Every structure is written in C-alpha cells, then in structure tokens.
Amino acid sequence: MAIRVLIVDDSATARTVLKDVLSKDSEIEVIATAPDAYVARDKIVQLKPDVICLDVEMPRMDGISFLKKIMKYFPTPVLMVSSLTQDGAQVTFDALEAGAIDYVAKPHSNIYDGIDEIQKELIQKVKMVASSNLSARIEAAKAKTSTLEYKPKATYSLAQTTNKLIAIGASTGGTVALAELIARFTKDTPGVVVVQHMPSGFTNSFAQRLNSLCEVEVKEAEDGDIIGRGRVLVAPGDLHMVVRRDGGNYRVKLGTGEKISGHRPSVDVLFNSVASHVGSNAIGVLLTGMGSDGAKGMLKMKTSGASTIAQDEKSSIVWGMPKVAYEIGAVDFVEPLSNIDVKIASLLSERK
C-alpha cells in the first residue's frame, strides 16, 4: 500500500512542485495539500495521512505551533520543509524538539530550479518518516522538557587535556537524542567528538543551542581544535572530521574528501580515525539514524580495544545505524538512550 502524504505549505508553487516530485514514486500517494494549518487540520481528521510534509513558515498559525497540536491531538509522523538559513536552522531545531521526525531544506534558489537537488532526499525521507518509531519520538519530546534545563556553564581550560575520548555518531532523530545525552555530561567528562548528519548551515546553530543548555562546552569544531575534558566538538556540516594525536593532546582535523557511506561528515571516517589514534582509550556511541554510516567504523573501534555502545530499538526514532552495527558484531552494549550516560560512566570508572 502506498504511503499517503499530506503537503502543508502556504506557497501554491511549493505545493505543486512537492506534489509532482513525490507523485513520481509509485510507493507514495499525495492524498491532499493545504495552504495553512486550519485547512490542514480538517484534512488530517478526514483523511488520516501516513506522513505530513509541513512548511515551517505559514500564515495564521506557524508550523511549530501547528506541529505541537498535531503531536498532542493527532500523532502523525511529520517531515518539516525548512529554509536553509540561520533563522531556518533555529526553527528547524524547535520543530525537531516539538516532535518532527526529520527535515528537508528547501533549495536556496527558486524551488522550480532547485528541486532536483532535493528530489532524491525528499522521497527517501518521506519513506523513512513513514516507517519511523513515532512513539519513541513522542517520548523523546517529553524527555526534552525535563532534561534540557539551563545548567551553570563550566569554565573550559585548554589545560584540561584528555586521555580518554568519547566518539558519538547520529543521524535521523539525533539532534534530540544528542541533546538529552550531552545534557547529562559534566565538566569532568572526557573529551567528546560528534558527527551528526546535518547541512553546513545548521551545525554551528546546533552546537550553540546545546552549549546554552549543557554544563560542558559545546562548539562546532575548527581545524586543529584540542579535544579536552568537559568539551564537545561537533563536526561542521559538509566536512569530514578525524582525530589525531599531537604530543600529549588529541586534536581534530577537518577536510573535504569524497562522501563516505553517503555522508560528509561521515561517522565511519571519525570512528576509523579514533580506532587508529585512540584505540582502547576510546568509547564509541552510535545513536538513532537511518542507514549504516558508523557501523564499520564502530567495528574497527571495537577491534582496536574500544568499548562500543548502540542505542536500543525502542528508544531510537530510526533504528538503522545502530542495528547494522549490532548485526555485524560491532556493539558491546545495547542501551536505551536514558541509560547511555550511566553506561559511559561505568566504563570510565572500570578503566581508571
């Protein structure tokens, strides 16, 4: 049976283009479109779509407010369609925290001219959103309310070197999962490096958002940054990030290079470098995400002596990357998101 999609966008042009693109795939049926939240509400009640493609900026009621109502009254998997701008990034994170499964960034140019850039991604993500774990998404949104409270900022010092290192990879659902996990880290947590699949315009905003909520320092990585205790470095969008040993320190190195496992930044690229340069002093964590990026790299980390943790299926929005890692024997521990920080602390205490 085809995936039944409702498109909600105030632009008639956007509605037409999105419908034309999605209708090209035989597994997707666009059952209706709506110009605003009020028309969309009636369509949802009447048609009960499998997936809603929702524009962020709309008249009468903005996309975030409407999204919250959808999650409360008509829980349905939602794919946000947002502009790739600084403001667009902030609103997109609001949407993900409010319950959206994922997002697609609208083309910079005229949507007619730029639709080819996102056609494959749009179709792929509609299918992924349709099969996602909506109950885990709703629980994650609830957990966000209790977890993401302001915490006093620890003062980071470059003198705080780290001999242990935590490497984390995530994709779909990862922004909320990372926020919940990193909010539990303290100033004494070993240095953390993160790859979250995200466009280049979004990663700095994401890091700043986490930094305002967490005790540890969170920043978008810059080439040559030192990895230190109480510090979390997030790989910039569209750049690979690797770890290198530099005397008594670990540093990150950024570069372009080809996409690996379909992504740049790639979790596999990060994990492979951690396996080579950190070995048994590392802990690898693979969170919710579509695809297989990070699985082979995690296996290499495990082979090098690192401990490895995968998020469990029940708490994952999309159990893709962790599942593949588990299936190839790369995972030591499968944990719910709420217990991953506890497992990390336990592993660190064992290795003192």
From Swiss-Prot:
Entry annotated with the keyword Cytoplasm: yes
CDD domains: CheB_Rec, REC_CheB-like
Keyword Phosphoprotein: yes
InterPro entries: CheB-like, CheB_C, CheY-like_superfamily, Sig_transdc_resp-reg_Me-estase, Sig_transdc_resp-reg_receiver
Keywords from the named record: Chemotaxis, Cytoplasm, Hydrolase, Phosphoprotein
PTM-bearing positions, type 4-aspartylphosphate: 55
Main location: cytoplasm
Active-site residues from the entry: 171, 197, 293
Molecular function per GO: phosphorelay response regulator activity; protein-glutamate methylesterase activity; protein-glutamine glutaminase activity
Broadest EC class assigned to this enzyme: hydrolase
PTM comment text: Phosphorylated by CheA. Phosphorylation of the N-terminal regulatory domain activates the methylesterase activity.
PROSITE patterns linked: CHEB (PS50122), RESPONSE_REGULATORY (PS50110)
Domain Response regulatory: 4-121
Subcellular location: Cytoplasm
Domain CheB-type methylesterase: 159-351
Gene3D superfamilies: 3.40.50.2300, Methylesterase CheB, C-terminal domain (3.40.50.180)
Known EC number: 3.1.1.61, 3.5.1.44
GO cellular component assignments: cytoplasm
Function: Involved in chemotaxis. Part of a chemotaxis signal transduction system that modulates chemotaxis in response to various stimuli. Catalyzes the demethylation of specific methylglutamate residues introduced into the chemoreceptors (methyl-accepting chemotaxis proteins or MCP) by CheR. Also mediates the irreversible deamidation of specific glutamine residues to glutamic acid.
Similarity-based family: Belongs to the CheB family.
Domain text: Contains a C-terminal catalytic domain, and an N-terminal region which modulates catalytic activity.
Annotated protein name in UniProt: Protein-glutamate methylesterase/protein-glutamine glutaminase
Organism: Sulfurimonas denitrificans (strain ATCC 33889 / DSM 1251)
Taxonomic lineage from the root: Bacteria, Pseudomonadati, Campylobacterota, Epsilonproteobacteria, Campylobacterales
Originating gene: cheB
